[in-house]
From Swiss-Prot:
EC number(s) per entry: 2.7.13.3
Region (Interacts with KaiC) location: 1-97
Record function comment: Member of the two-component regulatory system SasA/RpaA involved in genome-wide circadian gene expression. One of three clock output pathways. Participates in the KaiABC clock protein complex, which constitutes the main circadian regulator in cyanobacteria, via its interaction with KaiC. Required for robustness of the circadian rhythm of gene expression and involved in clock output. KaiC enhances the autophosphorylation activity of SasA, which then transfers its phosphate group to RpaA to activate it. Autophosphorylation and phosphotransfer activities are not essential for clock rhythms in continuous light, but they are essential for adaptation to light/dark cycles.
Subunit-structure text: Homooligomerizes. Part of the circadian clock (KaiA, KaiB, KaiC, CikA, RpaA, SasA), the composition of which varies during the circadian cycle. Binds to the CI domain of KaiC; KaiB(fs) and SasA compete for the binding site. Binds preferentially to doubly phosphorylated KaiC. Interacts with LdpA.
Entry GO MF terms: ATP binding; phosphorelay sensor kinase activity
InterPro entries: HATPase_C_sf, His_kinase_dom, HisK_dim/P_dom, HisK_dim/P_sf, KaiB_domain, Kinase_SasA, Sig_transdc_His_kin-like_C, Thioredoxin-like_sf
Descriptive protein name: Adaptive-response sensory kinase SasA
GO terms classed as biological process: circadian regulation of translation; circadian rhythm
């Protein structure tokens, strides 16, 4: 390799980064590069970091690499990139020049004080790496903000149209009641029945608006913000009956059968009643929506452990494809079966946040053509909530 390097040059290692992919050829190239460097490493300090491009995409972008394998000489001196399948041949030809450049770089300099910070992998963390990490963090923050903004825009666009439907129906029902009430002084039984039906329709539609607004408010909260709950002792059976009454018109209009299986000795829950009602309404609303006319919906509660109660809602609908079970609780997820149904794909995400805020768990079991069962757990009253 010619004359030995000066002490100044020896004080600063040659910093190299080798970018490879997962192809079998990559391991062969890594070994050949190491062999070439080993020939001079006894007299010249060399730091080689092998990087999988899939693990460090920010560095690939930072160095503007377009081909793998690629070897980046970070320093001393100016940066240089070798790439392609003949990389090892390029390195064998280029390495002597790098060593000469290293000697020239330090020829008129004082020996530097070596104080190189190291990464978790034990490799030098150079200013270039620090800049790349900072750049990557900014990219991540920008991507998160962009995704958040896009999500909010999608929600607003969806809500702008869909909120008008139940609101228009409710207002029409109320206006009709007002007009009819002026046309007779003594209402007959039939007329009163009609008025009651209109009132029920208005109430149902207004509650639907209330539910959608609640979902939107929860879904638009920052994902990292913990959900606030006000837990207290809750008797499950009366709360369930209130929810069933609220959705009565929905399942009765489809002639569906609702079966409840709640043990009389079920312990009281330690939960926020409004949040628990929100979960039940969402899950039952979905069950009613996807169960065909004449189908069956079952609500069951089981005291599984001394600290948890499991609540399950089953339907006889079309079921959920297995490959979509893992994403069903994410924001704005709309399955292929949902194309003809109302909704934004945020209800189940809200349910998950509520259940997790109670230190519970929610999951689904489903087979295509055999319906779905959503399970979630809630703490019993004597359970002490963590601070």
């Amino acid at each position: 390799m010619g004359e030995s390097l000066s002490p100044q040059a020896l004080a600063q290692p040659l910093l190299l980064q080798l970018f490879v992919d997962t192809r079998p050829l990559s391991q062969h190239i890594v070994q050949r590069v190491k062999n070439i460097l080993a020939a001079v490493e006894a007299t010249v300090p060399i730091s080689l970091q092998v990087i999988n491009v899939a693990d460090q995409p920010q560095l690939v972008e930072y160095y503007r690499l377009v081909v793998t394998p690629a070897l980046v000489k970070i320093g001393p001196g100016s940066r240089q990139v070798l790439s392609g399948i003949d990389l090892t041949d390029q390195l064998a030809n280029q390495l002597p020049q790098w060593l000469v450049q290293q000697e020239a770089f330090f020829a008129d300099r004082e020996p530097p004080e070596v104080n190189i910070p190291f990464t978790e992998l034990g490799q030098p963390e150079t200013p270039a790496l620090q800049q790349a990490d900072a750049f990557f963090q900014l990219q991540q923050q920008y991507a998160d903000l962009s995704e958040r903004t896009k999500f909010l825009e999608q929600v607003i666009a969806l809500v702008a149209h869909d909120l008008r439907n139940p609101l228009t129906a409710a207002l029409l029902a109320v206006d009709t009641i007002q007009i009819r009430s002026q046309s007779f002084s003594v209402a007959t039984a039939k007329e009163m029945q009609g008025l009651c039906s209109l009132f029920d329709q208005a109430r149902s539609q207004l509650r639907e608006i209330e539910r959608m607004i609640a979902e939107i408010l929860e879904a638009t909260r920052h994902s990292g913000e913990s959900l606030r709950i006000n837990p207290r002792e809750v008797v499950f059976e009366p709360l369930l009956q209130q929810v069933l009454e609220q959705l009565h018109e929905r399942w009765r209009s489809k002639q569906q059968q609702l079966i409840t299986d709640v043990p009389g000795d079920l312990p009281t829950l330690y939960a926020d009643p409004d949040r628990l009602r929100q979960v039940l309404v969402n899950l039952l609303d979905n069950a009613i929506k996807y169960t065909p006319p004449g189908g069956t919906i079952t609500i069951a509660a089981l005291h599984r452990t001394s600290q948890k109660v499991q609540i399950s809602i089953s339907d006889t609908g079309s079921g959920i494809p297995r490959d979509q079970l893992s994403v069903i609780f994410k924001n704005l997820v709309r399955l292929s079966r949902d194309s003809s149904q109302e909704g934004y794909g945020i209800g189940l995400s809200v349910c998950q946040r509520i259940v997790q805020a109670h230190f519970g768990r929610i999951w689904v079991a489903s087979e295509l053509g055999q319906g779905s069962t959503f399970h979630f757990t809630m703490p019993v009253y004597r359970y002490t909530m963590p601070c």
